[in-house]
C-alpha cells in the first residue's frame, strides 16, 4: 500500500477508480447499517437470555451472530476499500465469501485474509510450517490459532475459540483425505456448523452462557 502513496499519478482524480470506490463504500455501509445492525438487536437479546433459549432460538441466535459478524466486519472493510479506491489506493481484499468454505483450511483462506497472511508469514513459516513432519505441523497450527485468539482479545473465551479452530485445523490436516471424499454438501454442513458453534464462544460473555447456548443447539 505504501508505494501507492508515493505514486504521483495517484494524486489526481480518476473517475474509473472513484465510481467503483463509491459503490464499494455504499455496499459496505449497507452491510453494516442495514444488515449487521439489524441482526445485532436480536443477537444481543438472545445472548442476554442464553440460559433460557430453546433449540430453535439458540440456532437462530448463533447463526444470527455468525451473519452479524461477517456483515459488520466485511462492511467496514468494504468501506475502507471504497475510500481507498476513491483516492486511487487499492487495499487488499479481506473477505472472499468465507461461509461458502467446505473445510476449515479454506475458511481461513477466505476469512480475514490479511490476518491469515500475517500469521502464516510471521508465525507459521518461522516455526517450520509443514516442513518438519505431521506432529510439528500440528503443534505449529495450534500455536498460530492460539495467538489468533489472543489477537482478538485477552480473554479466556477468545483463547478457547482459537483452540477450537486450531484443533479443527489439526483434525482436517490428519483426516483430509476421507473428509475431502465426502459429498460437498455434507462438507459444507460440517464446516459451517463448526464455525457457527465456535462463534458462540467468541461472542458469549461467559463460558456458562456459551455452554448453555451450545447445549440448547444440540438439544441437550
Can you say where each PLM-predicted feature lies in the sequence?
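Membrane-embedded transmembrane alpha-helical bundles that form the catalytic cores
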Residues: 1-220
